[in-house]
Amino acid sequence: MSSRKSKSSNLIQADYISQVQRILRERFCHQSPHGNLFGVQVQYKHLIELLKRTAIHGESNSILIIGPRGSGKTMLINHALKELMEIEGVSENILQVHLNGLLQINDKIALKEITRQLNLENVVGDKVFGSFAENLSFLLEALKKGDRTSSCPVIFILDEFDLFAHHKNQTLLYNLLDISQSAQTPVVIIGLTCRLDILELLEKRVKSRFSHRQIHLMNSFSFPQYLKIFKEQLSLPSVFPEEIFAEKWNENVQSLSEDRSVKEVLQKHFNVSKNLRSLHMLLMLALNRVTPSHPFITAADLMEANQLCSMDSKGNIVHGLSVLEICLIIAMKHLNDIYEEEPFNFQMVYNEFQKFVQRKAHSVYNFEKPVVMKAFEHLQQLELIRPMERTSVNAQREYQLMKLLLDNTQIMNALQKYPNCPTDVRQWATSSLSWL
């Protein structure tokens, strides 16, 4: 009987864990509009007022949201649209068109996507239009019920806005902004970009039709605010089905935020990037370790997640190299030390390696030159070294100038973790200069 009870309690616990993971993963991955905004309240107020003027009063406009990747541009617009759609009578009478510069790579594809999102495929049918502007104006005309006041407002959201500026003649941007300046269908054009020089990319005729409204997003919060965000992002909502479990989870999150080792991890993360996307990645990796037998996140989970986040990919490649390839990298390191980061060629590296072999008088490192050349080429394929200029057909491979793409710290850290690294090779790496 007791085994049955323990089985059922384990199943209930597993169900709670899966619900926790679903809620938090949705929060971390999909930037759910149900979450909170951090440090952008002023910008949010500006944006929502602009959208309301279009949706309620039929006022056309255009605006750019500018900020580095991960600063919350998409989250800001999603929150604003959610609030707008909750206003009575707005959701039925407003249309949204979402375009992305990475997907809609030219105006023709963009126009097809606009047609699809506005559900106007049946209106266009087999009609033939002379120009892009004619086609677009016909589509917008189809949305009109009568005069300006009764036309259906359209919100155009252009993600990766700077890529649309590279379209031929910027026809799409010109026509959308032209409509926003004229007394036609009420439209608001919202551009999302990470480029501060975006206005310099616009043609004069496009720039003259843009309202020059801009919202800048910069992650300017302090570490105490970052710690508060950490707590809020990990905490379960009050509507969680099991109150007792949610209370225990939130108490654990509170104790984590006060833990010294956790604060150190978060401080390191904060110093590298204030980007909330990188914080979400850290929390996601820690959340993956939660199981029915390990129901709460611990400080050790966060420390391990931080190690995974800050893992050096090039350093990891070095762990899988052969001893010969490691020796060549050490030879390059010494050449960099002697010649102060000047480029080197294979012959120089080979000579440096030979000094080590002769000094140690080891037959184990006595490789034929073609074998050493093959190892050198493998390092180039792994992109641990790169040629300084394009390879000429007639150029001898031994004398092509190369540059090492690892610094001394990366090499030494990788050697510390290298499995069964020979002692004399490690000593050679730590010697101040080469074997002169």
From Swiss-Prot:
One of its GO terms (cellular component) is nuclear origin of replication recognition complex. Coiled coil: none annotated. ATP binds at G67, P68, R69, G70, S71, G72, K73, T74. Pfam families: AAA_16, ORC4_C. GO terms for molecular function: ATP binding; ATP hydrolysis activity; DNA replication origin binding; nucleotide binding. The modification N6-methyllysine is found at K7. Keywords: ATP-binding, DNA replication, DNA-binding, Methylation, Nucleotide-binding, Nucleus. The keyword Acetylation does not apply. It comes from the Eukaryota. Gene3D superfamilies: P-loop containing nucleotide triphosphate hydrolases. It is found in: Nucleus. One of its GO terms (biological process) is DNA replication initiation. The keyword Nucleotide-binding applies. Belongs to the ORC4 family. Component of ORC, a complex composed of at least 6 subunits: ORC1, ORC2, ORC3, ORC4, ORC5 and ORC6. ORC is regulated in a cell-cycle dependent manner. It is sequentially assembled at the exit from anaphase of mitosis and disassembled as cells enter S phase. Interacts with DBF4. Interacts with POLQ. Component of the origin recognition complex (ORC) that binds origins of replication. DNA-binding is ATP-dependent. The specific DNA sequences that define origins of replication have not been identified yet. ORC is required to assemble the pre-replication complex necessary to initiate DNA replication. Binds histone H3 and H4 trimethylation marks H3K9me3, H3K27me3 and H4K20me3. This is Origin recognition complex subunit 4. The lineage of its organism: Eukaryota, Metazoa, Chordata, Craniata, Vertebrata. The gene is ORC4.
